[in-house]
């Protein structure tokens, strides 16, 4: 299935518009963020950001199949196979086959191609009109020079999605006026500054907070020293932020460092991580926690996001010479 998806994405990539950035070789998050951030007059534009609710599982297969057939007209056997796969209502759940509305099977490699294909017409419409727009699977952002024009384009999106049997997640809709911060794909942009989005900062801080509490309980239960608990915290977040050799998830370094041009959010995360480490090492939230010095953290293996960020860009500058 992975090989089939790879071949589909490569062979039929010309079907897709350049304003689509999901699951495309050499045309992904970095290209999306930079295209938007460096668009002429971007700081004078109004924006609208939307997230399609439960996109993969909500795509009506009966509406998708005609699009798929048109996309691969010279592959009747492949279309027949994919049709049977998509129309089969049975799924495995707890080892049992049960009927379910599965859409295009979120989590299946094939779903990435189908998710790109289903809204390709919307992408093409915005491209044809030369309207600034970007889509990454179920995330859409559009821009316009006036509030009235923005509303007109928003209505096109709402109407198109309704015709496609899709809904927008109202909790993830946002609008901005010229000069205000807009967010797309985890990056916040304002006045030429690209930073980690506030929600992404809060998510990593929440993970640090939960891990600190878990390690405190573990240390109490196993009679582990505070310093060893702090060392465990450092090991976990070094792996999550920088290394991650086991998981397929992108680390912070791989995802954010090429995209941002400020260390503002990294300073905030560093400061919070150091608070957690001090709390674990000293078993206190008071000022006495500062008796555990930064040099001691480094001896335990702590790596600052800010330092690693500047090292990354220093190496990149050297590679560009």
Which residues are covered by each model-predicted region?
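Conserved phosphate/pyrophosphate-binding and hydrolysis machinery centered on Walker-type P-loop NTPases
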Residues: 26, 103-104, 108, 259-266
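A broad, low-specificity signal for short, low-complexity segments enriched in glycine/proline
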Residues: 6-13, 101-105, 147-151, 233-237
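Conserved two-metal-ion catalytic palm core of "right-hand" nucleic acid polymerases
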Residues: 1-69, 73, 79, 90-93, ...
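Right-hand nucleic-acid polymerase module
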Residues: 2, 95, 99, 124, ...
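Conserved polymerase palm-domain catalytic core
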Residues: 18, 33, 38-137, 141-160, ...
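Short, intrinsically disordered/low-complexity patches at protein termini
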Residues: 24, 72, 159, 207-208, ...
């Amino acid at each position: 299935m992975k090989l089939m998806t790879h071949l589909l994405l490569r062979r039929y990539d010309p079907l897709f518009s350049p304003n689509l950035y999901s699951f495309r070789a050499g045309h992904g998050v970095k290209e999306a963020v930079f295209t938007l951030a460096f668009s002429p007059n971007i700081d004078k534009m109004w924006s609208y950001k939307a997230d399609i609710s439960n996109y993969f599982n909500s795509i009506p297969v009966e509406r998708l199949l005609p699009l798929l057939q048109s996309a691969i007209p010279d592959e009747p056997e492949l279309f027949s196979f994919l049709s049977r796969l998509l129309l089969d209502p049975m799924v495995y759940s707890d080892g049992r086959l049960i009927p379910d509305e599965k859409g295009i099977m979120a989590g299946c490699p094939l779903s990435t191609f189908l998710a790109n294909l289903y809204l390709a017409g919307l992408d093409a419409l915005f491209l044809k009109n030369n309207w600034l727009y970007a889509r990454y699977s179920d995330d859409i952002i559009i821009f316009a020079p006036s509030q009235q024009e923005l509303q007109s384009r928003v209505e096109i999106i709402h109407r198109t999605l309704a015709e496609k049997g899709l809904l927008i997640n109202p909790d993830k809709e946002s609008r901005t006026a010229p000069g205000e911060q807009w967010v797309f794909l985890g990056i916040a942009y304002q006045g030429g500054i690209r930073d980690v989005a506030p929600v992404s900062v809060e998510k990593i801080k929440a993970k640090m907070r939960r891990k600190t509490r878990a390690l405190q309980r573990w240390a109490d239960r196993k009679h582990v020293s505070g310093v060893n608990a702090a060392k465990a915290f450092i090991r976990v977040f070094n792996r999550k932020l920088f290394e991650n050799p086991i998981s397929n998830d992108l680390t912070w370094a791989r995802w954010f460092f090429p995209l941002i041009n400020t260390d503002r959010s990294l300073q905030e995360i560093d400061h919070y991580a150091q608070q957690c480490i001090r709390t674990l090492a000293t078993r206190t939230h008071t000022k006495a926690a500062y008796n555990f010095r930064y040099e001691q953290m480094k001896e335990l293996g702590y790596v600052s996001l800010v330092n690693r960020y500047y090292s990354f860009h220093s190496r990149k500058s050297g590679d560009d010479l």
